[in-house]
């Protein structure tokens, strides 16, 4: 009886170890993987979006980073705001897509978004993202 219990305990311990290893790999997803899982369904793997309803993430976001309110915009839009990943992971995804899809259009002295900046911005969902974008993005054109 003891050996049967010991064998069952080893099996449970082995299964628990596999589960912990698998879950740690899930939580350690790269920014690219998180982008593919949570963003590419609408914005496509290439970041091109689906005009006119889903905006592109290519080139345009780099130019937006010169306007302070637009840094928050990237975090506060419904898709980013509600994605089921941590603030730290969202920060990595946004910084990754800025560099991956926008390196040629980022401001000369671009600073990556910080986790604190993302955490704070994520507290305030945009009620009307298009209106906010029109209001603050005009400042780039001025």
Report each predicted region and the residues it spans.
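Flexible coil segments in periplasmic/lumen-exposed cytochrome c-class electron-transfer proteins
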Residues: 88, 99-142
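Gly/Gly-Pro-rich "capping" loops immediately C-terminal to redox-active cysteine motifs
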Residues: 48-83
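Stable alpha-helical elements in mature extracytoplasmic
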Residues: 31, 66-73, 89-90, 114-121
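Bacterial N-terminal signal peptides
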Residues: 11-23
């Amino acid at each position: 009886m003891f050996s049967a219990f010991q064998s069952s305990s080893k099996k449970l311990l082995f299964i628990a170890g596999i589960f912990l290893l698998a879950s740690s790999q899930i939580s350690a997803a790269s920014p690219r993987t998180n982008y593919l899982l949570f963003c590419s369904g609408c914005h496509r793997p290439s970041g091109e979006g689906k005009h006119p309803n889903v905006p592109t993430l290519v080139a345009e976001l780099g130019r937006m980073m010169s306007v302070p309110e637009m840094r928050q915009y990237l975090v506060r839009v419904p898709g980013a705001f509600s994605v089921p990943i941590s603030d730290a992971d969202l920060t990595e995804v946004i910084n990754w897509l800025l560099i991956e899809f926008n390196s040629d259009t980022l401001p000369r002295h671009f600073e990556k978004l910080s986790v604190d900046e993302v955490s704070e911005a994520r507290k305030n969902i945009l009620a009307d993202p298009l209106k906010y974008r029109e209001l603050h993005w005009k400042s780039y054109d001025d």
